[in-house]
Amino acid sequence: MRFTVKQIAWLKVFLHLAGFLPLVWLFWAGHQGYFSADPAKDIQHFTGRMALKFLLATLLVAPLARYAKQPLLIRIRRLLGLWCFAWATLHLTSYTLLELGINNLALLGSEIINRPYLTLGMICWVILLALAATSTQAMQRKLGRRWQLLHNFVYLVAILAPIHYLWSVKIVSPQPIIYALLAVVLLACRYKKFRQWWR
């Protein structure tokens, strides 16, 4: 049984809630003092993990639609990608305002240059910005074949983002490793596509 247009619409509502409600929880948790002695780090890690979750969900759509023979699932991919960018932007903002502080914004450039894991994170964010800005059908028509070439850079983000996460934690825990392995699996699902690039 294939999804109907109406079912996809309801799925989009659910996914919007999945993207928005964690933000509500984040504010509530901060107000209730739920975080540890270093709430800035907690918020940074939470927002970063949310961005990674939506990135992986975005990458899951195409193989899932293909293997499950559910072509309409492709319609949720843009939504997931935009939530990935939204959470990545919150992640960057939380680092800038909570870690550096509003009075030290001038240090952001040097921090990105001098800390390799921040360099990777910024590369990911810039790519996501470009993908979000060109995600509309109008931009797809305007860019033509270049649109697909640009959006293939999401695979670079899928490689760099888990490395950024692994590099940023002081104590390696199972969580960043799991995200990295999931990214590898989702990229491996596209091995035929990657092979065609090298022919």
UniProtKB/Swiss-Prot annotation:
InterPro entries: Fe3_Rdtase_TM_dom (IPR013130), MsrQ-like (IPR022837). It is found in: Cell inner membrane. One of its GO terms (cellular component) is plasma membrane. GO terms for biological process: protein repair. Binds 1 FMN per subunit. Keywords: Cell inner membrane, Cell membrane, Electron transport, Flavoprotein, FMN, Heme, Iron, Membrane, Metal-binding, Transmembrane, Transmembrane helix, Transport. GO terms for molecular function: electron transfer activity; FMN binding; heme binding; metal ion binding; oxidoreductase activity, acting on diphenols and related substances as donors. It comes from the Bacteria. It is a multi-pass membrane protein. Its cofactor is FMN; heme b. The chain crosses the membrane at residues 8-28, 54-74, 82-102, 116-136, 149-169, 171-191. Belongs to the MsrQ family. Part of the MsrPQ system that repairs oxidized periplasmic proteins containing methionine sulfoxide residues (Met-O), using respiratory chain electrons. Thus protects these proteins from oxidative-stress damage caused by reactive species of oxygen and chlorine generated by the host defense mechanisms. MsrPQ is essential for the maintenance of envelope integrity under bleach stress, rescuing a wide series of structurally unrelated periplasmic proteins from methionine oxidation. Heterodimer of a catalytic subunit (MsrP) and a heme-binding subunit (MsrQ). This is Protein-methionine-sulfoxide reductase heme-binding subunit MsrQ. The gene is msrQ.
